[in-house]
């Protein structure tokens, strides 16, 4: 018993460590993905109108590298989470991620963090696209004073893509918030269903409202079960022994042999003074056989009652001579 009791907390602790590792991989991968996307956009816009010699090689490589590493971490965490959930379902255990952080599930926390990261990234991209000036008239007048017009083209131009991409990333973040809300609602409904199943006798007394078009149909609550205690209560060992004692012996044992079954030996020992009358089907005479323990004082036999009145009739016949 002690080995089983110590094995269960070790298994739960291991599952919690795995859940924390999966959560860390999700958050780390999402953060790297957002940073990589931001660096890639900034590097692309900064190096778009500059020659390759003036553009830093680190700025061009850091963004895609961070994005690839973050995407790989998210994919790894996703596959590890599916494998862990499948293993828990095979063992028939409860999912430990249902109450991961402050009573909420791990998926809910992940969606909240993803939504916050994408919302922040989208706002930064939108601010960058709006704050940096584009190709307006003030920027277009600068190259007129220079002799070489080929080198005097505006270098910060084309930030319209950031102004379009920013709201799209913000929209993705809002979608993550909606998914988090749906996850929380599903978890609440599933926990409510499990509590109702575990309760068994819990019965809702509220009417059911069903909307059909513009009309609302109200159905009364379902009736309570007929035998709530018999289905919910578990049989106790004392009750089983009592039922075994009170149950009568089988019909075949009484009819053929007139002896109690082994299950009712205790009942026969308690009822020593009781007689069981059985009818034997083999003989034609209606004799009554006694089984069990007979009392000490037996009643007189039927033959003795027939011979008793015959003796006084025979005595005078012998006494009177011819």
From Swiss-Prot:
Where is it located? Membrane
- Compositional bias (Low complexity) at which positions? 228-241
One Pfam family named in its UniProt record = TMEM171
| Classification via InterPro entries | TMEM171
Record's GO cellular component, any one?
A: membrane
Q: Where is the composition biased (Polar residues)?
A: 242-267, 279-289
Disordered: annotated span: 223-322
Report the main location listed first in the record.
Answer: membrane
Key words, A-Z:
Membrane, Transmembrane, Transmembrane helix
- Signal sequence segment: none
Task: Report membrane topology.
Answer: Multi-pass membrane protein
Q: Membrane-spanning regions, if any?
A: 22-42, 57-77, 112-132, 159-179
What is the protein name for this chain? Transmembrane protein 171
* Gene (name only): Tmem171
